[in-house]
Amino acid sequence: MLIVEGMPLLYLELAVGQRMRQGSIGAWRTISPYLSGVGIASLVVSFLASVYFNVINTWALWYLFHSFQDPLPWSVCPLNSNHTGYDEECEKASSTQYFWYRKTLNISPSIQENGGVQWEPALCLTLAWLMVYLCILRGTESTGKVVYFTTSLPYFVLIIYLVRGLTLHGATNGLGMFTPKIEQLANPKAWINAATQIFFSLGLGCGGLIAFASYNEPSNDCQKHALIVSVINSTTAIFSSIVTFSIYGFKATFNYENCLNKVILLLTNSFDLEDGFLTVSNLEEVKNYLASTYPNKYSEVFPHIRNCSLESELDTAVQGTGLAFIVYTEAIKNMEVSQLWSVLYFFMLLTLGMGSMVGTGTAILTPLTDSKIISSYLPKEAISGLVCLLNCAIGMVFTMEAGNYWFDLFNDYTATLSLLLIVLVETIAVCYVYGLKRFESDLRAMTGRTLSWYWKVMWAFVSPLLIVGLFIFYLSDYILTGTLQYQAWDATQGHVVTKDYPTYALAVIGLLVASSTMCIPLVALGTFVTRHFKIREQFSAA
Amino acid sequence: MLWALFFLVTTIHAELCHPDAENAFKVRLSIRAALGDKAYVWDTDQEYLFRAMVAFSMRKVPNREATEISHVLLCNITQRVSFWFVVTDPSNNYTLPAAEVQSAIRKNRNRINSAFFLDDHTLEFLKIPSTLAPPMEPSVPVWIIVFGVIFCIVTVAIALLVLSGIRQRRRNNKGPPGVEDAEDKCENIITIENGIPCDPLDMKGGHINDGFLTEDERLTPL
């Protein structure tokens, strides 16, 4: 997927930016005036993405600030009102889940119940946006220096975590997940997930790559850069997955052993066996013995005995915010000197998030500062300030009690279809509208390198077909599943339940997708109409 | 005769203390879980100590200062180790109310635990909830302090950058016109007059050549 899809598309975007020397709107307008809608669509997608993405930085800041306590606040459950036991919700779920759902998000039972804006996340969101503003304030002059830091620190922390992770008890169980299951490779869903992952991790279609490339020297060898960047991207992904899997194995082993201990305790207490008699090794035989000797009592106790299995613990695949804030914190609280590991981890998360925000911010600002209309009225600092302020104001939605549900909604639906469509139109535009031969000669004039046949084939045929395939798959998936659903936290039961989206949420989803995809045809139509009228005017004047 | 009396006393004891008796509490110890290799064996001497600790706790209750070790009865001792106990009044006729026993045990829980090197989890009194220590709450939550520090640093940095940007722009506006921003992508547009850039014609560094006529003298005065 990397070779077939990632590298060609990355090279294409870098080359377009370097050649046109403008942000996304201007670049596509130069290729063809009908296609400036592509640039606008990129801008809209980047804007929507930046609105919801900074909320992750908010949460990272929140956890970072809370890591300076002993013990860590998510490692112990708070007491209930009369101090006789632990809080009920915390008992049913785990302390890390409780801290995430109750203390951080204060989540409501469903997306309809909005609740009010909560001041603690709102403060952290404001701070997060101030930090982003600080980084993109001066444009690429400052972002270049910031990015040196935000890119190198995560590697440093990952190496530390790699060493720590591999030495944890039970880490090898998680690393066993690395062996690819051959039958999964035959499943087309796996390939589709791989294609989507490459697509979004490289940031294609957001306009950020074009914006950054437009600041390059014209003679810059963007082919070499495209290759290096995509290879490093994938290597980093594999590297961080080693760390993740070892931490995962540690957590799964820990939970499995806890589960076994609970079963042992339950049996010891119910049958008044000698303390320490039941161990992990003789558990099964003793269970059978008890079942045969005291059948009545055993059948009473049996419903409470959970079947502990290491495989099921490992199989609970989590991704996204669940992985970062629940699974990792659970693993961290069991390590020694957990405050240090926690601070390191959330600082790394913060720098990664800031790096992404800087990229998205540049993708938004470059077209705005390039356009003569806006930049003649306002200086660069004011434009970035206004954009940050607007984003922060809209982002307050995500600090409400139902905010996490809206976040998931934005996360799942903002970028998927729109980016696929944008990149498809980009590839077709460069190859067929602008002309592959013309682009090739432009590149040769700029960089002095000839375009090899591999890139030509990829750009003209393979990548567009692949994207069309992905697009069709996602559309059919959405249509076939009927109503879209989301995961809601049930405080009374202590785990997530699936609920349907209400109609207005579905309307918002439709609006999100439409606002970016409709730009392309609408602007094309608009340009056509205005041109048509201009030509008519010229004819009638003559 | 003596045998009959002994039999009577044991029967009364058996009636007072049995599983789920009125005012009886079940106790459960997990010695090996708590102490591992250093675990001691639970024998009659340990039971004696337990009865002594319960009697000690009851003596702290007003009106019960006369409680003796013999008034604490244990029964149904299992290998777990678990057993039931009751506290009787001095006449050994009835058991003391559960509420009194419960409050006495709760008040002295730490002493009882430490006598056996155990804690609330490994020495359990079923139906007597233990009072958990509340977590330490500092007066100002720590996170607000850290937040405040970082917030101030970021605001100051932004203010500095914005001010320096404004100052630089003001200096540029006063300086030679036509020179654009440093990080511009296009080449600097330098106003050109007859192929000679205007900048070097600035009088700042050069000497005035008096051979040339100044502006006023070109037109000879009348």
Swiss-Prot record, chain B:
Its main location: membrane. GO terms for biological process: calcium-ion regulated exocytosis; insulin secretion involved in cellular response to glucose stimulus; positive regulation of amino acid transport; positive regulation of L-proline import across plasma membrane; SNARE complex assembly. The record marks 125-126 as: Cleavage by BACE2. Residues 163-222 are cytoplasmic. It comes from the Eukaryota. Disruption phenotype: Deficient mice are viable and fertile but exhibit a severe defect in renal amino acid uptake due to down-regulation of apical amino acid transporters in the kidney. Greater urine output, more dilute urine, a defect in urinary concentration, higher osmolar clearance and an increase in free water absorption, suggesting an osmotic diuresis. Decreased urine osmolytes sodium and urea, presence of tyrosine and glutamine crystals in the urine, and increased excretion of amino acids in the urine, suggesting an aminoaciduria. It is found in: Cell membrane. Glycans are attached at residues 76, 93. Residues 21-222 form the Collectrin-like domain. Glycosylated. Glycosylation is required for plasma membrane localization and for its cleavage by BACE2. Proteolytically processed in pancreatic beta cells by BACE2 leading to the generation and extracellular release of soluble CLTRN, and a corresponding cell-associated C-terminal fragment which is later cleaved by gamma-secretase. This shedding process inactivates CLTRN. Three cleavage sites have been identified for BACE2, two clustered sites after Phe-116 and Leu-118 and a more membrane proximal site at Phe-125; the preferred BACE2 cleavage site seems to be between Phe-125 and Leu-126, Phe-116 and Leu-118 act as alternative sites. GO terms for cellular component: brush border membrane; cytoplasm; plasma membrane. One of its GO terms (molecular function) is transporter activator activity. Residues 1-14 form the signal peptide. Induction: Up-regulated by high glucose concentration in beta-cells (at protein level). Expressed on the apical surface of the proximal tubules in the renal cortex (at protein level). Kidney; collecting ducts and proximal tubule. Pancreas; beta cells of islets. Expressed in the cerebral cortex, hippocampus, brainstem and cerebellum. Keywords: Cell membrane, Glycoprotein, Membrane, Phosphoprotein, Signal, Transmembrane, Transmembrane helix. InterPro entries: Collectrin, Collectrin_dom. It is a single-pass type I membrane protein. The chain crosses the membrane at residues 142-162. The modification Phosphothreonine is found at residues 214, 220. Residues 15-141 are extracellular. Belongs to the CLTRN family. Plays an important role in amino acid transport by acting as binding partner of amino acid transporters SLC6A18 and SLC6A19, regulating their trafficking on the cell surface and their activity. May also play a role in trafficking of amino acid transporters SLC3A1 and SLC7A9 to the renal cortical cell membrane. Regulator of SNARE complex function. Stimulator of beta cell replication. The cleavage site containing the double Phe-Phe motif acts as negative regulator of shedding by BACE2. Monomer. Homodimer. Homodimer; dimerization prevents CLTRN cleavage by BACE2. Interacts with SNAPIN. Interacts with SLC6A18; this interaction regulates the trafficking of SLC6A18 to the cell membrane and its amino acid transporter activity. Interacts with SLC6A19; this interaction regulates the trafficking of SLC6A19 to the cell membrane and its amino acid transporter activity. Interacts with SLC6A20B. This is Collectrin. The gene is Cltrn.
